[in-house]
């Protein structure tokens, strides 16, 4: 006979484990820490030459194993209709480049099921980003719920896969990927409509273009260079001198009605970074 019952919350459906036990599995200090350290949830992952392929499960193995036992216990006691499912409504990744835009390279990002030995992209949801396309935001939508089961001693789980291609001559970090998602667990599974991976290119923020005039630019320079900070000696220049010269040029331009003030003065052989990027 099929299981019949009302739709209730997870803790209401089972008495196999106490509410405190379930809460500890999901929200303990260790569980939260491992979501960051093992899964990189909400953290910036650097793509380097020595880490060309990154596979990150969306749930730490320890948490997955504890949840699997929790569901199995309730199922075997006849209190849960299944051994548990994990669902992830959406995975959102913010990708930025950390090398010059003319560097030849790309990233390939997709979701995979660790229960698949080939780790093929789920429903062909793959996003390829050339270095010149960055920054960008990409999103993925799994089209099924992942059963909470063990395969060869490893808990089955969705995983985010990031592959770095090209970037010849760039051995350091070429891109930063910050990913966010919210896994959900239930004794009942969901049905999904097919969905394609999303990709949105992001225009770099031009802070200087939003300033109203020379005085605003001067205030920005002052806040960035911070006259009260200790003097930092560079080859041939000091930050304080650069700031004063920049202000003089801005004042001169302000006195000229047809002068352009929306671009940074080019007075040094080396560029001055004023926007913090």
Swiss-Prot record:
Query: Where is this gene product found?
Result: Host cell junction, Host plasmodesma
| GO annotation terms (biological process) | transport of virus in host, cell to cell
Q: Which Pfam families match?
A: 3A
Entry keyword set: Host cell junction, Transport, Viral movement protein
- Record's Gene Ontology CC terms? host cell plasmodesma
- Outline what the protein does: Transports viral genome to neighboring plant cells directly through plasmosdesmata, without any budding. The movement protein allows efficient cell to cell propagation, by bypassing the host cell wall barrier. Acts by forming a tubular structure at the host plasmodesmata, enlarging it enough to allow free passage of virion capsids.
Q: Tell me the protein family, please.
A: Belongs to the cucumovirus movement protein family.
Query: What is the name attached to this protein's record?
Result: Movement protein
Where does this protein come from, organism-wise? Tomato aspermy virus
The root-end lineage is: Viruses, Riboviria, Orthornavirae, Kitrinoviricota, Alsuviricetes
């Amino acid at each position: 006979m099929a299981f019949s019952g009302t739709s209730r919350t997870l803790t209401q459906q089972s008495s196999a484990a106490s509410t405190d036990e379930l809460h500890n599995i999901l929200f303990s200090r260790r569980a939260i820490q491992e979501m960051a350290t093992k899964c990189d949830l909400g953290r910036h992952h650097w793509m380097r030459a020595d880490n060309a392929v990154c596979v990150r499960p969306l749930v730490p193995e320890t948490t997955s194993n504890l949840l699997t036992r929790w569901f199995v216990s309730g199922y075997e006691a006849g209190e849960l209709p299944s051994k548990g499912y994990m669902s992830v409504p959406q995975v959102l990744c913010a990708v930025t480049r950390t090398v010059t835009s003319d560097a030849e390279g790309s990233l390939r990002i997709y979701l995979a099921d660790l229960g698949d030995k080939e780790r093929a992209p789920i429903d062909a949801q793959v996003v390829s980003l050339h270095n010149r396309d960055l920054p960008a935001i990409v999103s993925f939508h799994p089209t099924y719920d992942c059963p909470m089961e063990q395969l060869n001693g490893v808990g089955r789980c969705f995983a985010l896969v990031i592959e770095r291609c090209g970037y010849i001559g760039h051995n350091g970090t070429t891109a930063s990927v910050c990913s966010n998602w919210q896994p959900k667990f239930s004794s009942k599974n969901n049905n999904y409509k097919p969905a394609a991976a999303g990709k949105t290119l992001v225009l770099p923020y031009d802070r200087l273009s939003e300033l109203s005039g020379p005085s605003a630019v001067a205030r920005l320079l002052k806040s960035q260079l911070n006259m009260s900070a200790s003097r930092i000696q560079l080859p041939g220049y000091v930050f304080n001198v650069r700031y004063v010269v920049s202000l003089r040029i801005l004042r001169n331009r302000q006195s000229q009605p047809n002068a352009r003030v929306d671009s940074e003065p080019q007075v040094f052989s080396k560029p001055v970074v004023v926007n913090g990027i």
